[in-house]
């Protein structure tokens, strides 16, 4: 799941750089296929998570304790992120921008930048929720620290940007150095 979050963040980062002309603009298909890959990985992670549940038949009730349980919060944020990434890719595929709805701006891909910003917030919220699940376990003293959240965020970001590097080598070679550089930084 972390690699999918990181991949989405990498896609959104490149689009943001392109919006301010720091990178060349990419064809919409680059974002469509990248988003599709991220959604497939998120679905795979969600499916895999059912295998470590003691009683998978009770999974539907896991969101009911969202006020006190980081796991419940994760169960809420993950589908929201999946939806945001799916909509991000779909809007790229359809070629929509705010002009489609009568709002004129000078920024290409303005609607996807707005959707992507919401998705980025959800991706970071999911890193927080996932990290806090383990950081709150007191008997695992090595994990019961705020650094667990930092590690989840950094490993997810680095693996996602590395995946974006591999993807761009195939789909958009001019972005390989950009993604590889960010992978090294993270």
Name every feature range the model reports, one short phrase each.
Residues 23-84:
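Membrane helical hairpin/interfacial module
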Residues 6, 10, 47, 53-56, ...:
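Alpha-helical transmembrane segments of polytopic integral membrane proteins
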Residues 5-15, 45-49, 87-90:
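Alpha-helical transmembrane segments of multi-pass membrane proteins
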Residues 1-37:
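N-terminal signal-anchor module of multipass membrane proteins
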């Amino acid at each position: 799941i972390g690699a999918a979050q990181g991949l989405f963040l990498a896609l959104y980062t490149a689009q943001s750089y392109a919006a301010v002309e720091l990178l060349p603009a990419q064809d919409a298909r680059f974002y469509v296929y990248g988003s599709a890959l991220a959604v497939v990985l998120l679905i795979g992670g969600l499916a895999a998570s059912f295998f470590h549940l003691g009683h998978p038949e009770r999974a539907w009730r896991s969101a009911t304790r969202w006020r006190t349980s980081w796991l419940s919060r994760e169960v809420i944020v993950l589908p929201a992120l999946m939806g945001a990434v799916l909509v991000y890719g779909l809007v790229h595929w359809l070629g929509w921008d705010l002009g489609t709805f009568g709002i004129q701006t000078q920024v290409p891909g303005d609607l996807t930048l707005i959707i992507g910003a919401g998705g980025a917030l959800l991706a970071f919220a999911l890193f927080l929720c996932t990290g806090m699940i383990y950081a709150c376990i007191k008997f695992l003293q090595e994990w019961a620290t705020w650094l667990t959240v930092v590690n989840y965020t950094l490993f997810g970001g680095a693996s996602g940007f590395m995946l974006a590097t591999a993807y761009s080598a195939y789909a958009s070679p001019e972005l390989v150095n950009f993604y590889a550089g960010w992978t090294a930084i993270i």
